[in-house]
């Protein structure tokens, strides 16, 4: 889901780094090269606020504005990796239904090809870089970070933290077909950790990621979609897909004894609802109709767009601290457990 880019002059956000434009990146006087990936609305707003006429924006793409994920809100940007972008998207389609380990290794391979192409296009006058996390280790491999300062725009947890969270979940879950299907190579994990430690700023709207970098994290404000006024209800929902790392086992325990079956959104990728009655629904227009609360015990969430939609519509969320939302926008999973003991059903009235 892509939302319109907002103006920093009219968005009304005061907790965002962009509330005082120019402070966020503490930009140096030299030319800045921005090497970015997907145009998240939060990052696009930042670029729109801070990009200077002499700056350089290098992004993937096939033609300007296509695919839509690369639709940056500026005219002054260059497609520096067209053939590599085509290869990336073809590969993504080819492995879309492959096991997670195969998909992730494919993505990393093509990220490397794109990053090296972008590195070759960096203006020699650029002494500071703002780089997407996807490109970070490969830009270093290409020598593009040498003699330059850089900020990192983070869209996922660092590999080291991903591994830690997955190992922690695996220890609780036991056997799973997917919880251990991918681990990045140790050299890549170490390189990313070293480069993140060197970065001047870590830029992200994700509160969990930002918490890993105290004193250096620059918070962006999540863009919330406009409210849709869904039909009121008191049903409890689990935000899928159903896969071990989303922790449906926790949702099962929390909703045991409820009068109505748990609503499970998204595809079922692992058989984890055996002997449990659920009501399956698809994520589409009106998906929040009748929902009184959302359970989201996922091991980690990188881009919580559906959670943001729930927040915008006043639907209570019970989630882990790795969900990415601001603490005021969700309640800890433990709060739902305590309430569930006190009452067999959480209604829209008691959840507010």
Regions found by a protein language model. Name each.
Residues 1-82:
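N-terminal subdomain of nucleotide-sugar transferases
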Residues 46, 222-285:
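Conserved catalytic-core segment of nucleotide-activated headgroup transferases in glycan assembly
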Residues 93-101, 152-187:
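Acceptor-binding helix/loop patch of EC 2.4 sugar-transfer enzymes
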Residues 113-121, 158, 171-201, 289:
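Membrane-proximal helix-turn-helix segments that form the acceptor-binding/catalytic region
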Residues 285-286, 304-312, 323-326:
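Short alpha-helical segment that forms part of, or immediately flanks, the ligand-binding pocket
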Residues 292, 314:
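A short alpha->beta transition loop at the rim of the catalytic pocket in nucleotide-sugar-dependent
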Residues 299:
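Aromatic "clamp/platform" in nucleotide-sugar-dependent glycosyltransferases that forms part
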Residues 316-320:
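Short hydrophobic beta-strand element within catalytic cores of glycosyltransferases
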């Amino acid at each position: 889901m892509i939302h319109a880019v907002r103006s920093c002059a009219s968005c009304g956000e005061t907790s965002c780094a962009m509330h005082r434009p120019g402070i966020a990146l503490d930009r140096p006087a030299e030319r800045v090269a921005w090497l970015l990936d997907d145009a998240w609305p939060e990052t696009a707003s930042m670029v729109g606020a801070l990009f200077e006429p002499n700056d350089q924006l290098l992004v993937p793409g096939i033609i300007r504005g296509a695919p839509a994920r690369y639709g940056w809100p500026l005219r002054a940007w260059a497609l520096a990796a067209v053939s590599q972008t085509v290869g990336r998207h073809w590969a993504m389609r080819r492995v879309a239904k492959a096991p997670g380990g195969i998909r992730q290794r494919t993505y990393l391979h093509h990220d490397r090809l794109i990053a090296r192409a972008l590195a070759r296009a960096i203006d020699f006058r650029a002494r500071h870089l703002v780089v997407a996390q996807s490109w970070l280790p490969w830009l270093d491999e290409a020598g593009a970070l040498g003699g330059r300062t850089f900020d990192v725009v983070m869209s996922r947890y660092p590999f080291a933290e991903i591994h830690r969270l997955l190992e922690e979940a695996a220890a609780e879950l036991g056997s799973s077909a997917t919880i251990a299907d991918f681990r990045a190579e140790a050299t890549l994990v170490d390189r990313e950790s070293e480069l993140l430690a060197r970065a001047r700023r870590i830029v992200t709207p994700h509160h969990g990621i930002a918490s890993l970098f105290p004193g250096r994290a620059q918070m962006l404000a999540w863009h919330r979609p406009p409210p849709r006024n869904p039909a009121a209800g008191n049903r409890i929902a689990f935000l899928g897909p159903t896969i071990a790392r989303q922790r449906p086992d926790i949702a099962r325990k929390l909703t045991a004894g409820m009068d109505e079956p748990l609503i499970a959104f998204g595809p079922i990728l692992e058989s984890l609802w055996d002997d449990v009655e659920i009501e399956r629904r698809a994520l589409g227009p009106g998906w929040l109709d009748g929902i009184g609360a959302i359970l989201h015990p996922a091991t980690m969430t990188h881009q919580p767009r559906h959670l943001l939609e729930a927040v915008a519509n006043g639907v209570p969320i019970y989630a882990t601290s790795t969900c990415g939302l601001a603490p005021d926008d969700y309640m800890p999973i433990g709060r739902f457990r305590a309430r569930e003991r006190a009452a067999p059903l959480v209604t829209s009235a008691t959840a507010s």
